[in-house]
From Swiss-Prot:
Disulfide bonds: none annotated. Keywords: Cytoplasm, DNA damage, DNA excision, DNA repair, Excision nuclease, SOS response. It comes from the Bacteria. This is UvrABC system protein C. GO terms for molecular function: DNA binding; excinuclease ABC activity. Residues 15-94 form the GIY-YIG domain. It is found in: Cytoplasm. The lineage of its organism: Bacteria, Bacillati, Bacillota, Clostridia, Eubacteriales. One of its GO terms (cellular component) is excinuclease repair complex. Belongs to the UvrC family.
Length: 601
């Protein structure tokens, strides 16, 4: 995806907190980051190269796609960022993020008189853990506040204590060590604290607000200010952490929303209570298929390809045959699998967050589709076409000084790339003649369609070639020879002029014209695809011409050498012993390699 296309997509990114993922052409995650405002933060990566940090500039050279997950708060985004970095281990996050774990609030509920304190890890299965939290300093202050509000003990042990500590005199401890509070009363305080940490903090906030108002009326301004600060801290701590669930659940969340032409399915993978991955799927919806049937199809398809099946799968809609699907899932793993729609609690809240992300994606796609349909309609008017084109194809040629000449064919349907329809061509005739190469490519493409080759069907509604008048006339001759009446145009890169067959005067559209921008996207994608294939061909030729000529070095040995040394140049620099140590090699074969490169030099 070109830089301009990414910038266009960036305009649709919401102004909300969340996490973004930059990816390369293969879909590998290169970088995970968080933002208080997603669009603003992501936009900073697309500024002028000279203004970028060298590391950022190096990363962006590989970025060809991005994804994002919207969260309810920046705190959630921080935690999700941490989880995703640990999960994906992106190349460009290694030096930019540490691998520390965020702290938790631990309540030792198994103790007779539980205490609450900060913990870095979940070390036992009996205590209650809340968090994690990202601001350690604020968390320590809040812990002091909680101990003051609820009066729980802060001492490590009560065994050696014979009299109350200073906290009791300051009103910050209920002093269970001195017997001033019963186990039952203390337990009620612990439960109140747990209820607060679970998110039900409005009641205590209301009580504090009443106290603050009374203090203000009594002119106790210092007390009122202290209560105001406590309320702010309580609200900050009370912000629910939906990105990490309270228990170490192993589950998937699957949410489905219906668009006009297809269903969008979003999958969040939760492992050890953390969201560690996101998958997005678009399902073309058959006529009269309801959401339950669509969900059944997706579950079967997704988990047939994915062996990582957790014991619990939470859904926005149950499959039409949920019990049958559960039995099928169980047959694929060694444990029971439950499918259900959560009705309340934190699981319901996380599913709602997933569906909010799905809604944003669906709305973005619908806006983009409407925009592209408008661009196609406009293009039909300015190019004087009889019908609005749906399938657009663009052809481009790439070579280096006439070496390894190749051509590309890219396809846009409805204004969007149809990558499964992309094709490469190795030029068979004139290697150093772009015009002749374009004519050959279009001829071969159309001949394949005429022979009913399914890989080249249907025929295009419009053909675009990279070039000017010479290129468009050469391809027009092919269409005339084949008796085909397909609208044909060329787009010249220098001045972005549109050429038509037999007309020397180009059509010039405004730079912001949405029809021109669509043709530019199509042309740039064909250019990228052609260059990529040419580079692969030249790299393959370099590797094969060197190693395939060495006696005793077959396909497997060549592969082992390239895997071990990563390049032919490094093989040439290696010693006899280093080459002989490669799996599958021996001293005789290593000597043949050494002698071959020695004779070459």
């Amino acid at each position: 995806m070109g830089d301009e296309m990414l910038k266009e997509r960036l305009k649709k990114v919401p102004l909300q907190p969340g996490v973004y993922l930059f990816k390369n052409q293969e879909g590998q995650v290169l970088y995970v980051g968080k933002a208080r405002v997603l669009r603003q933060r992501m936009r900073s990566y697309f500024q002028a190269p000279e203004r970028m940090h060298p590391k950022v500039k190096a990363m962006m050279a590989w970025v060809s796609d991005f994804d994002f997950i919207v969260t309810h708060s920046e705190m959630e985004a921080l935690i999700l960022e941490n989880n995703l970095i640990k999960s994906y281990k992106p190349r460009y996050n290694i030096d930019l993020r540490d691998d520390k774990s965020y702290p938790y609030i631990k309540v030792t509920v198994a103790d007779k008189f539980p205490r609450v304190y900060l913990a870095r890890e979940k070390k036992d299965g009996v205590s209650r853990y809340f968090g994690p939290y990202t601001d350690v300093t604020s968390l320590r202050d809040t812990l002091k506040l909680l101990n003051g509000v609820f009066g729980l003990r802060s001492c490590r042990t009560m065994k050696s204590r014979r009299r109350p500590c200073l906290n009791r005199d300051m009103g910050k401890c209920l002093s269970p060590c001195s017997g001033e509070i019963s186990e039952e009363e203390y337990s009620q305080k612990v439960q109140a604290l747990i209820t607060f940490l679970e998110g039900d903090f409005q009641e205590i906030v209301r009580e504090k607000e009443k106290e603050m108002a009374m203090a203000a009326r009594s002119l106790e301004f210092e007390k009122a200010a202290r209560l105001r600060d406590q309320i702010q801290s309580l609200r900050q701590l009370g912000e629910k952490q939906k990105i990490e669930l309270a228990s170490p659940y192993e589950l998937d969340l699957v949410g489905m929303l219906s668009g006009e032409k297809e269903n969008l399915v979003l999958v969040f993978k939760v492992r050890s209570g953390k969201i560690v991955g996101k998958d997005t799927f678009w399902l073309k919806r058959p006529i009269q298929e309801d959401e339950n049937e669509a969900m059944e199809f997706f579950i079967k398809h997704y988990y047939d390809e994915n062996p990582d099946i957790p014991p619990e799968i939470l859904l926005s809609h149950l499959p039409s045959e949920s019990k049958l699907v559960e039995a099928w899932l169980k047959s694929r793993v060694s444990h029971r699998v439950e499918l259900r729609v959560p009705q309340r609690g934190e699981k319901k809240q996380v599913l709602n967050m997933l569906l909010e992300n799905a809604r944003l994606l669906l709305e973005e796609k619908q806006r983009e589709e409407n925009k592209q349909l408008a661009a196609l309609s406009h293009l039909a008017r300015v190019l004087d076409l009889e019908v609005v084109p749906n399938r657009l194809e663009c052809f481009d040629v790439s070579h280096l000084a006439g070496e390894e000449t190749v051509a590309s064919m890219v396809v846009f349907v409805g204004g969007q790339p149809e990558k499964k329809a992309y094709r490469h061509f190795k030029i068979r005739t004139q290697q150093n003649n772009d015009t002749a190469s374009l004519a050959e490519t279009v001829r071969r493409r159309l001949e394949n369609a005429r022979q009913a080759n399914p890989a080249f069907l249907p025929e295009p509604d419009l053909i675009l070639v990279d070039g000017g008048l010479g290129q468009v006339n050469a391809v027009a001759a092919v269409l005339q020879e084949m008796n085909l009446d397909i609208p044909l145009f060329a787009l010249a890169e220098k001045n972005e002029e549109i050429y038509r067959p037999g007309k020397s005067q180009p059509l010039v559209l405004a730079a912001r014209d949405n029809g021109l921008q669509l043709l530019q996207r199509l042309r740039d994608e064909a250019h990228r695809f052609a260059i990529e294939y040419n580079r692969k061909r030249r790299a393959k030729k370099i590797r094969s011409s060197a190693l395939d000529e060495i006696p005793g070095i077959g396909k497997q040995r060549k592969k082992n050498l390239l895997v071990h040394f990563t390049s032919v140049a490094k093989i040439k620099e290696a010693s006899l012993d280093e080459i002989a140590a490669v799996p599958g090699m021996n001293r005789k074969a290593a000597l043949a390699v050494i002698e071959f490169f020695h004779n070459q030099d």
